[in-house]
Amino acid sequence: MSLSIIFMGTPEFSVPTLRLLVDAGHRIVAVYTQPPRPGGRRGLDLQKSPVHQAAELLGLPVFTPVNFKDPEERERFAALKADVAVVVAYGLLLPEAVLNGTRDGCYNGHASLLPRWRGAAPIQRAIMAGDAETGMMVMKMDKGLDTGAVALTRKVEIGPNMTAGELHDRLMQVGAKAMAEAMVKLEMNDLPLTPQPQDGVLYAAKIDKAETRIDFARPALDVHNHIRGLAPFPGAWFELEIGGKPERVKVLGSELAEGQGAAGELLTDDLVVACASGAVRLTRLQKAGGKPLAAADFLRGTPLAAGMRLS
């Protein structure tokens, strides 16, 4: 036996779930993903989403509505007569007509331990807040923002130096397995739902460019969490005066270090920077238009000395 599934997702994070559902023998009757976006060096080429590309390689039908406001779009969804819809980082709001448009509703894979970090950026926010643990949850969607009842939980430890990129890749695989397991249980009519707690609700707002600059006038642990929570994208950054003009440098890796000094002061020649309390060592950096480099390689091209100030 197998389920007939509508899959809804867009980025790379969603692809392993789609592939695992196909490998499990489920019938994917349609794949919904966001429309192609301008891309390429000049933004002239329309680029299909990772899910769109994966679906085409799997020979699956793909739909790319801008939204579900058009009644015909909602009718097309319902006409698929699927058992269930699986939603993983789709990126579009689903009206009630879609949420209720399959036999068993819509199940979402969300990258946090709900109700903590509902919303758009749960991976980054968990690290930026210094959380030691997160996870993947499969929930049955309702009309609220990540408020649905929970069907399955898989916890994941966040290492002290783990970046958002590393956690993304770990949760991507954990989430795929969790959703595949949930669909087996759903098919067996053995997927009980538990309402989310009323306490502990936090919202993971989308990352704003204005918050990406590093503030070395914060404690070292906060600076370290800020850096790794934004690595590799969009990247936390500081400004450095090179050749008489300020240049933006992204920091893609850091670790806590010993030392005290004025906030932003380079304490050593190997990129230990003083914070409000304590210090951080910058381990991976990237200048505008350049490649990410380990600290030693970065210093070969951009000599920095103790006593300089980063801002």
Curated annotation (Swiss-Prot):
It catalyses: L-methionyl-tRNA(fMet) + (6R)-10-formyltetrahydrofolate = N-formyl-L-methionyl-tRNA(fMet) + (6S)-5,6,7,8-tetrahydrofolate + H(+). Gene3D superfamilies: 3.40.50.12230. Its EC number is 2.1.2.9. It comes from the Bacteria. Attaches a formyl group to the free amino group of methionyl-tRNA(fMet). The formyl group appears to play a dual role in the initiator identity of N-formylmethionyl-tRNA by promoting its recognition by IF2 and preventing the misappropriation of this tRNA by the elongation apparatus. CDD domains: FMT_core_Met-tRNA-FMT_N (cd08646), Met_tRNA_FMT_C (cd08704). PROSITE patterns: GART (PS00373). The gene is fmt. Keywords: Protein biosynthesis, Transferase. NCBIfam families: fmt. It holds the Pfam family Formyl_trans_C. (6S)-5,6,7,8-tetrahydrofolate binds at S112, L113, L114, P115. InterPro entries: Fmt, Formyl_trans_C, Formyl_transf_N, Formyl_transf_N_sf, Formyl_transferase-like_C_sf, GART_AS, Met-tRNA-FMT_C, Met-tRNA-FMT_N. Belongs to the Fmt family. GO terms for cellular component: cytosol. This is Methionyl-tRNA formyltransferase. It comes from Rhizobium leguminosarum bv. trifolii (strain WSM2304).
